């Protein structure tokens, strides 16, 4: 899914592309595309490294969102079918 189509299909407006919720949704879209790519190209180590970097960034953003706005965090988790963060 292209970025413009993704922005149009998301619940957020075009002015809110910098919001944490949109960034997490966009990173989730990139994760899905990279995992599909890695199913066919399992020795593409640079893409694996990029996937790990994206997952780390998404994890940090999810942690920030859970601390600042718990209700938005829970609705986003349910909408994107992502597992909740582990509590330490």
UniProtKB/Swiss-Prot annotation:
Disulfide bonds: none annotated. It is found in: Plastid, Chloroplast. GO terms for cellular component: chloroplast; ribonucleoprotein complex; ribosome. The keyword Ribonucleoprotein applies. InterPro entries: Ribosomal_uS15 (IPR000589), Ribosomal_uS15_bac-type (IPR005290), uS15_NS1_RNA-bd_sf (IPR009068). Pfam families: Ribosomal_S15. Keywords: Chloroplast, Plastid, Ribonucleoprotein, Ribosomal protein. It comes from the Eukaryota. Gene3D superfamilies: S15/NS1, RNA-binding (1.10.287.10). GO terms for biological process: translation. One of its GO terms (molecular function) is structural constituent of ribosome. PANTHER family: RIBOSOMAL PROTEIN S15, BACTERIAL AND ORGANELLAR, SMALL RIBOSOMAL SUBUNIT PROTEIN US15M. Part of the 30S ribosomal subunit. Belongs to the universal ribosomal protein uS15 family. HAMAP family: Ribosomal_uS15_B (MF_01343_B). This is Small ribosomal subunit protein uS15c. The gene is rps15.
């Amino acid at each position: 899914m292209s970025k413009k189509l993704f922005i149009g299909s998301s619940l957020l407006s075009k002015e809110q592309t910098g919001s944490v919720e949109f960034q997490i949704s966009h990173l989730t879209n990139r994760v899905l595309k990279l995992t599909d790519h890695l199913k066919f190209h399992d020795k593409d180590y640079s893409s694996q490294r990029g996937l790990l970097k994206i997952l780390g960034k998404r994890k940090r953003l999810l942690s920030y969102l859970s601390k600042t706005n718990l209700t938005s965090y829970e609705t986003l988790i349910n909408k994107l079918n992502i597992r909740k963060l582990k509590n330490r």
